[in-house]
Amino acid sequence: MLPPKHLSATKPKKSWAPNLYELDSDLTKEPDVIIGEGPTDSEFFHQRFRNLIYVEFVGPRKTLIKLRNLCLDWLQPETRTKEEIIELLVLEQYLTIIPEKLKPWVRAKKPENCEKLVTLLENYKEMYQPEDDNNSDVTSDDDMTRNRRESSPPHSVHSFSGDRDWDRRGRSRDMEPRDRWSHTRNPRSRMPQRDLSLPVVAKTSFEMDRDDDRDSRAYESRSQDAESYQNVVDLAEDRKPHNTIQDNMENYRKLLSLGVQLAEDDGHSHMTQGHSSRSKRSAYPSTSRGLKTMPEAKKSTHRRGICEDESSHGVIMEKFIKDVSRSSKSGRARESSDRSQRFPRMSDDNWKDISLNKRESVIQQRVYEGNAFRGGFRFNSTLVSRKRVLERKRRYHFDTDGKGSIHDQKGCPRKKPFECGSEMRKAMSMSSLSSLSSPSFTESQPIDFGAMPYVCDECGRSFSVISEFVEHQIMHTRENLYEYGESFIHSVAVSEVQKSQVGGKRFECKDCGETFNKSAALAEHRKIHARGYLVECKNQECEEAFMPSPTFSELQKIYGKDKFYECRVCKETFLHSSALIEHQKIHFGDDKDNEREHERERERGETFRPSPALNEFQKMYGKEKMYECKVCGETFLHSSSLKEHQKIHTRGNPFENKGKVCEETFIPGQSLKRRQKTYNKEKLYDFTDGRDAFMQSSELSEHQKIHSRKNLFEGRGYEKSVIHSGPFTESQKSHTITRPLESDEDEKAFTISSNPYENQKIPTKENVYEAKSYERSVIHSLASVEAQKSHSVAGPSKPKVMAESTIQSFDAINHQRVRAGGNTSEGREYNRSVIHSLVASKPPRSHNGNELVESNEKGESSIYISDLNDKRQKIPARENPCEGGSKNRNYEDSVIQSVSRAKPQKSVPGEGSGEFKKDGEFSVPSSNVREYQKARAKKKYIEHRSNETSVIHSLPFGEQTFRPRGMLYECQECGECFAHSSDLTEHQKIHDREKPSGSRNYEWSVIRSLAPTDPQTSYAQEQYAKEQARNKCKEFRQFFATSEDLNTNQKIYDQEKSHGEESQGENTDGEETHSEETHGQETIEDPVIQSSDMEDPQKDDPDDKIYECEDCGLGFVDLTDLTDHQKVHSRKCLVDSREYTHSVIHTHSISEYQRDYTGEQLYECPKCGESFIHSSFLFEHQRIHEQDQLYSMKGCDDGFIALLPMKPRRNRAAERNPALAGSAIRCLLCGQGFIHSSALNEHMRLHREDDLLEQSQMVEEAIIPGLALTEFQRSQTEERLFECAVCGESFVNPAELADHVTVHKNEPYEYGSSYTHTSFLTEPLKGAIPFYECKDCGKSFIHSTVLTKHKELHLEEEEEEDEAAAAAAAAAQEVEANVHVPQVVLRIQGSNVEAAEPEVEAAEPEVEAAEPEVEAAEPNGEAEGPDGEAAEPIGEAGQPNGEAEQPNGDADEPDGAGIEDPEERAEEPEGKAEEPEGDADEPDGVGIEDPEEGEDQEIQVEEPYYDCHECTETFTSSTAFGEHLKTHASMIIFEPADAFGECSGYIERASTSTGGANQADEKYFKCDVCGQLFNDRLSLARHQNTHTG
């Protein structure tokens, strides 16, 4: 190989990696010299080539190109020969594979080529002198310290040879070429030509320093040996204990491999002084002071471990973190005295002390130069440059801010976000101090290459190979990796290192210490802590919610200085300013709103809105747990989820679990927004109880709706009414709520009212619920309804008798209802009189009369209500609920039960009203009570009765244009309230899909009725006729779709009642009269329940003309409305009032009563469970049941008509009766099941024709699974215009029929026009069944083509038989010239008996052929024998019994015995002809004696004929007969029969007079359904159509 001088001379401008010696000296002298001109540049590329990291996002092709370029730059093929390149590569690889214990020694010898290396290895034992090597090592530190500024050029060809970087991956370093190349490098180039390894250069220089300044050993005379020794030390750094210079070069090599150029703030480059702006800097302008990257490194900044935002401050690369930080960290221990064999061997304490003492001198300026690479150096010129390089490298890591070296041996005292971690800095500083500390001390230390130079500071474990040590350090790095992660989040190289070290976890939670791979994961994790804090804050009712968030320093470390924005309100941080702006919108204007809200809530004693901070806290964390259920405490992210959840409580029993009513079941949602909206508005109108001023009356109404919707009373002390009416007098402002007792003993009834006077006068009884007070007395009215529904089904367990006065407000009533339902299921009946303040147009006819009478048995106070129907029921009016309550624990206010609580009344009471009668409780506010309330209120108003009774009014008197709470629409199902009916309508659609509205336990399941009364037989006789008609309307629970209708209707009722009161005083109509008469005897103390509809009579304009419905008493302002309404009553409704005693689920609240006439509630059809939001829809729907007799039921004598539902609901009947749900439509008369409604329709028509069906017994329930109920109804009632000719199913439009016909096209059979397969009675055909039957032999085939081919066989057989018969006849004629023996081929079609074969009648007297069942008819018509036996003319063959046996069973005779009329054959089925001897197929004419007979027979037989069993026609040819048969039926009904060929019990035969219709039922076709027999198939098919419709 050529010497390095030659190589460098040929290519002086191709080097980039600097000579360590010239690096410092030349940069100071010639700062503008350009690097990249010398062979040492090849070492840089060599290191890059050997340590290039594959990064996926760069791509494989680019990586390959990069590798090729680096290899070319390293090997420089344009300046070197192939032999040199090969020698270089082989030597490098050889040095890699030699034993570890030989590597230091071999490197010290610096073999120039492979031959020299082999020689060294052969003479290893003789040449090995560890003492000399150790001594040569000792002097490095001192020399390096003294001569670091000297810059002497390398003086040995081998100066760069031995310095090879051998990392743990076993990368070889060719030392010889590097020595040569570096030797030829002149000082001017500043980068001595090295082979491919820059470490060789440095080591050579350091070796020379050792030779000059130490004890002048053999290395002093032989600098190459010293250099080679250093090379050995460096080379063995990875594997064995040796000089720390190798560590330094190892680290430098790894930096170079990452494309990093090191520079220092003072302008001294790490490896090239001043190269920050020259040399490769010029080639790579992206590099500058500090640690800079090559262009390719810059392109993949993440890959090479360079922080995006801190390129000017420094970077930690992957390799550097692994090998440098941990190795340098171990330098402290590695330099310890117990490992004195190591080159600068000294104890940790010693070198620490020394390093601290020398800070002021050289170490102070270059204190970290040797540190990062664990280097102790011999002192000479090359060592100085080496140390400068190392110093700059360290300064890059530890003095990035340019403020000088940091002298703390533990590392930089202040942490920078962009510096490496303290562990690394500490390790590097310790190693630098150790390597630079005490050269004199290290000189005395011998070097032992077998020692373990790498010692772990954490656990004290030592390693001989740096790779093992680094791997070990990785385990400890996991503990401190998060520190790195804070500063180098964006560095891919660092992230890769961290992943390899700690599994990718580099973000640590400050709360629990958990680490995460991604910052997003950490953010999500922190939310958990935040939520926990939120819950804690809620529990502690804290006003300010703490927002745990990353600190500014953390954010700076993670995202950089400019990558976070903090919200000053909640301290939440964001990466983007836009996110912060969006977030701050949450806080905008909340403070004022919250202040107002809290003030109002405090006035009312309630705080339902959280503090702003807590509210913001909830919003910040994704609104999680924002909606909380007050029943069970569960929280939800969305209000809809909470609503769904609350249904569970309302259905089951919201009070069972907690033992109390929900403290607050307010569902945040639209109503919350509206509530906030109303509170946020400027309010000028005085709201007496709420102490709010409203700008507009509508706002006051909205506010009142809020109060009436949700009563949140924190304690008993809050005596504000929920229902507020500004214009009312103070006496009228009776805001009565029903509040629970804390114990059963406290049974005093009182009314909580804003008027203390009224409170004293008319206290309402508080309900005891589980002996627990209810802090909030009212749940959502809807929730209550649902609870009532669910509990009503359960039925009451022995209820605890409780009653309460029936003075309730909007939600109070609902609340009572809810608890009525819930308490009943819990075994307690709260016998409170639920008197709704809505108009009752007529006295309710319910069982309430009896119930109230019996309620008096247990309670002394009972409201005597006109609705209680009988003047005989005029129980003394409740004297004073207060008295009653004080006198009797079981004080049971009269409970007025209305029609509206049909379901609850039926189910909640359990067995019926009887139990309620005993307890005197009616859990549902009644429309009867409403009537009474209205009547009493108006009466009292007219009579100016004193305000001794508490009055509830939900609507104001006077000229107010608004109706408080009138616009509030509440959902029965979940309690949600809506300001617009359209919102409620949309909302109710959800419930329509979710659950059945009805229950099997309800005979009558109409949810609401316009009229508040129920038909009752106990009603006064004089009012009964009129009431019965009105009850119809009431039972229908007519509602109006819009709030305008509500107000209008309510106004009608109010005016109606008011005018009645004005004119009659007590009598408006029969209803009013009765109501007033009933209640006229009540004392003044009776609580006057003034309904929401009880408007000031003076309010009603005389001009307002009311049009009253004569049938139901409903009033309309517009005549057209009345006309439309009367259409409902256009038909006669047969209503058994007793059937509807429990017909309606109670309404929710006063506003609900108002809405009873607005159509906002659901009306349920008791027959099919269909629910409707308007009563007219129910009427129209029920008309279907009434008109369609198939759908009538015995228990439903009324025929309420209804439109189709606005939204089809699930089949309630099917849900109530799962056994029927899976079945098809089934006829209850005959049990026949049908898949299609049309089939049932046709089938039922048969029953009607036969008068077998009565309307009450037809169908209990017809269920069509899979089809909409409305579709079924339509199919039952609409005229069928288009009928399928195949199966008979009919359709409304041709499109449906066309779709249906396509079904039959794919079926494997053909339908005849009159054919319906009997299997359709139950289910359609599912298998491939033979449908094509051969008329000749009875065989059946699936396809008609097969049948055609089969018939061809029969034709061939017929021809053969004809020929055979002709031949036989000819033979017979030969025997008897005068006697012709005709041969006949008989075709028996459709028979299960095989075709008869030609037979020759025996001419001899002893042979005679006859059919077994058919009498043998002689040609001349003679019949001998009393039993019709067949005899020959001369009687020769006659037997005593006249029978001739036919052994082979053939039925055909040549004499025409089988050619007899069908009638004759039928008449003589038993006739048999015997054949004593001969077989029937004897060819000879034995037995044939009479020629005339033979002639006659021949004439008869020569032309055979075929009988058609269906039309009795006869055919002479089989083809004609076959064609004729096709005319009867193109399809044979296939049914199992006893014999092959039978079809529907029919045996088809075509025979001659002697042929075989010999069985009685051969001619009959049997119906499989009813067993009836028919003469022909056509009749059977027609009959079967009657079964299938």
From Swiss-Prot:
Highest taxon listed in the record's lineage: Eukaryota
GO MF assignments: DNA-binding transcription factor activity, RNA polymerase II-specific; RNA polymerase II transcription regulatory region sequence-specific DNA binding; zinc ion binding
Keyword Repeat: yes
Composition bias type Basic and acidic residues, residue spans: 143-152, 161-182, 206-225, 295-306, 588-607, 868-881, 1071-1082
Biased composition (Acidic residues): 129-142, 1396-1416, 1450-1467, 1476-1496
Residues annotated as domain SCAN box: 46-128
Compartments (UniProt record): Nucleus; Cytoplasm
ZnF region ranges: C2H2-type: 454-476, 507-529, 565-587, 627-649, 969-991, 1107-1129, 1163-1185, 1225-1247, 1282-1304, 1332-1354, 1506-1528, 1565-1587
CDD domains: SCAN (cd07936)
Location (main, coarse): nucleus
Residue span of region 4 X 5 AA repeat of P-X-G-E-A: 1419-1444
Disulfide bonds: none
Record keywords: Apoptosis, Cytoplasm, Metal-binding, Nucleus, Repeat, Zinc, Zinc-finger
UniProt cross-references to Pfam families, sorted A to Z: SCAN (PF02023), zf-C2H2 (PF00096), zf-C2H2_6 (PF13912)
Gene Ontology process terms (BP): apoptotic process; regulation of transcription by RNA polymerase II
Gene3D superfamilies, alphabetized: Classic Zinc Finger, DNA breaking-rejoining enzymes
Region (Disordered): 128-230, 266-306, 319-349, 588-610, 838-930, 1056-1104, 1396-1496
SUPFAM superfamilies referenced in this protein's UniProt entry, alphabetically: beta-beta-alpha zinc fingers, Retrovirus capsid dimerization domain-like
Domain remarks: The SCAN domain enables PEG3 homo- or heterodimerization to control gene expression in a combinatorial fashion.
Function: Induces apoptosis in cooperation with SIAH1A. Acts as a mediator between p53/TP53 and BAX in a neuronal death pathway that is activated by DNA damage. Acts synergistically with TRAF2 and inhibits TNF induced apoptosis through activation of NF-kappa-B.
Full protein name: Paternally-expressed gene 3 protein
The species this protein was found in: Gorilla gorilla gorilla
Primary gene name: PEG3
